[in-house]
Amino acid sequence: MANFTAADVKRLRELTGAGMLDCKNALAESDGDFDKAVEALRIKGAKDVGKRAERATAEGLVAAQGGALIELNSETDFVAKNAEFQALADQIVAAAASSKAADVDALKAAKIGDTTVEQAIAELSAKIGEKLELRRVAHFDGTVEAYLHRRAADLPPAVGVLVEYQGSGKDSDKEAAHAVALQIAALKARYLSRGDVPEDVVASERRIAEETAKAEGKPEQALPKIVEGRLNGFFKDAVLLEQPSVSDSKKTVKALLDEAGVTVTRFVRFEVGQA
């Protein structure tokens, strides 16, 4: 008996853009495991699987201040453009910076004047008549460069990046860190270095590369080289230090940072509506 429902099939279809029968078969083959089903659909070549599977349904904004980055969600972009909503986000990110909250629960308990962040969100939600949600927060203690990107001039920032870095204290350090923040915002790096990629992710990408190559009819003896080439392509896309720089495509981000004498220690990227 299948351990998934019609609703599960619908959800997988919405996440991946694959056909209904393909989604049903993928869930059956994976015994109802969504991650395995997504992997199976990627092997079969479903369009936009990797990108659409990360998408969440939300509007809202991101805000940054003093080493803190938050995402505050609303149900509609109409509310996201609301001045009171944006003012609340500014208060919340200020509370995140001062309290150094490590997670959403800690930030909800932080104070905004005489009330808590959680209470302030609930009060504005009741006033506006729309569900509001503090989705996530990040805080870095070191030297930080922040970048916020708007999708349109009339909308609040929807993409936020924090880059923690070390340098020699020159003005050029900040310029290099800012360039990296722009890079992360645009090319959506997921990991800092190759060593930061989880082993299960590497294993999954290797399986996908191998099965896809087999499905394409590639010679058996050529598979190892093809798989390694495609895996290196994955690293080049997902790993910040291995990406070609947007400012000089002939050099990697690592090469430009080395030239600037700057070391990125960690980063985070929030995008409204993305996992």
UniProtKB/Swiss-Prot annotation:
Recorded superkingdom: Bacteria
The keyword Lyase belongs to this UniProt entry's keyword annotation: no
Report one GO cellular component.
Answer: cytoplasm
Does the record's keyword annotation contain Cytoplasm? yes
CDD domains per UniProt? UBA_EF-Ts
Functional description taken from the UniProt entry: Associates with the EF-Tu.GDP complex and induces the exchange of GDP to GTP. It remains bound to the aminoacyl-tRNA.EF-Tu.GTP complex up to the GTP hydrolysis stage on the ribosome.
**What is stated as this protein's family in its record?**
Belongs to the EF-Ts family.
Q: What is this protein called?
A: Elongation factor Ts
Query: What species was this sequence derived from?
Result: Mycolicibacterium paratuberculosis (strain ATCC BAA-968 / K-10) (Mycobacterium paratuberculosis)
Q: What is the lineage of its organism?
A: Bacteria, Bacillati, Actinomycetota, Actinomycetes, Mycobacteriales
